[in-house]
């Protein structure tokens, strides 16, 4: 699927650091396994919402389509429970209106009127009377995403408003992020005036980005930047963190320890990103002065476990010595039976240590 140069998913970065846009053009797009897993979960969620709103999607067609998704390599049964939470939230929102709202799923929205070449795909859009509600499904479990002033969703809302402004008297904007593996559901609201003010700001940043203007800015937005490992501005910012000035006393205060730990955490993250990049370059045959890629010791394993066990048993090794029977961990059990059933059955038996 084609992505806009100034797309919604990277808006927090290009609005905070416009110069990063041209810099990132030097790097190829690489889709991680986590991203692929998220895409599959989105497909499942989309199918379920369509079953909810499309009378033409018969049970037979739905079952057939779901089977194809379940046959994919990255499919996990827990995806069913997590996507159910997203669908149930949409259903709740639909029923909260006095009249049946307009609803669209996986709709392409265009906001190029403000951001040149700007477009994206909104997971779900609900419109009733003067209210436009954008709902976004995030399957990741790494870092919670805040919905407040979220640039990605604001651009989705902007595109949806431009598409429907002649049909609905939109004055009120709602945005929700459903993160079932993390914080659950978060909603934030703003006025149309606020959205259009944001649009003007996005327009200014977009022009700067396309022209390669503005300074490079280090921050949380660097997390998903393709140039994060080799960006000199980020390197300078992180090296500044290392220049910690101590007061002329023999012992650190608790406040100083807290500050040092936070700086060390940020530095450690940056160094690991550089190490990962350096390793990938070494494996490509590029020379990193003073460093080289070496083979790790690795872990021993049988070429074929079944064959190995068979040989051991044939040579008098008792079968009970070769197996270990134990319960799965809490997380493994939840994954096997699904989050919803897990919580219903044993949720009240869980304690936090």
Each predicted region: which residue ranges?
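Hydrophobic/aromatic-lined pockets within catalytic cores
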Residues: 49, 53, 139-142, 157-165, ...
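Extended, charge-rich alpha-helical segments
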Residues: 269-353
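Short, charged/polar micro-motifs that form catalytic or ligand-binding hotspots
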Residues: 27-35, 142-150, 215, 250, ...
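Short acidic (Asp/Glu) and glycine-rich catalytic loops that position anionic groups and cofactors
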Residues: 18-24, 176-186, 226, 238-246, ...
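Short, charged, low-complexity amphipathic alpha-helix
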Residues: 174, 196, 200-266
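Short amphipathic alpha-helical coiled-coil/interface segments
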Residues: 83-86, 90, 260-278
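Metal-dependent nuclease catalytic cores that hydrolyze phosphodiester bonds in DNA/RNA
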Residues: 1-132, 172-174, 264
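Mg2+/Mn2+-dependent nuclease catalytic core
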Residues: 36, 99-207
């Amino acid at each position: 699927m084609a992505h806009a140069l100034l797309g919604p998913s990277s808006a927090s970065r290009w609005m905070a650091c416009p110069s990063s846009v041209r810099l990132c053009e030097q790097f190829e797009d690489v889709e991680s396994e986590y991203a692929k897993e998220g895409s599959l979960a989105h497909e499942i969620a989309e199918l379920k919402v369509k079953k909810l709103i499309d009378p033409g999607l018969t049970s037979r067609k739905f079952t057939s389509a779901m089977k194809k998704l379940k046959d994919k390599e990255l499919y996990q049964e827990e995806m069913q429970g997590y996507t159910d939470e997203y669908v149930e939230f949409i259903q709740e929102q639909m029923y909260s209106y006095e009249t049946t709202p307009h609803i669209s799923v996986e709709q392409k929205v265009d906001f190029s009127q403000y951001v040149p070449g700007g477009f994206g795909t909104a997971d779900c859009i609900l419109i009733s009377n003067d209210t436009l509600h954008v709902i976004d499904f995030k399957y990741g479990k790494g870092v919670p995403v805040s919905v407040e002033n979220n640039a990605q969703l604001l651009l989705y809302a902007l595109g949806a408003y431009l598409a429907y402004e002649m049909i609905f008297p939109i004055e009120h904007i709602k945005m929700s992020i459903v993160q079932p593996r993390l914080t659950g559901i978060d909603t934030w609201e703003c006025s149309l005036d606020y959205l259009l003010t944001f649009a003007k700001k996005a327009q200014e940043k977009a022009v700067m980005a396309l022209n390669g203007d503005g300074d490079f800015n280090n921050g949380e937005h660097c997390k998903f930047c393709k140039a994060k490992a080799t960006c000199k501005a980020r390197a300078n910012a992180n090296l500044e963190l290392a220049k910690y000035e101590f007061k002329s006393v023999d012992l650190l205060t608790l406040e100083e320890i807290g500050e040092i730990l936070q700086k060390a955490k940020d530095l450690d993250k940056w160094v690991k990103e550089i190490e990962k990049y350096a390793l990938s370059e070494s494996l490509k045959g590029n020379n990193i002065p003073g460093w080289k890629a070496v083979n790790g010791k690795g872990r021993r394993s049988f070429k074929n476990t079944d064959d190995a066990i068979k040989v051991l048993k044939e040579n008098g090794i008792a079968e009970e010595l070769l197996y270990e029977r134990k319960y799965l961990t809490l997380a493994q059990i939840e994954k096997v039976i699904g989050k919803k059933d897990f919580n219903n059955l044993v949720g009240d038996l869980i304690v936090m240590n």
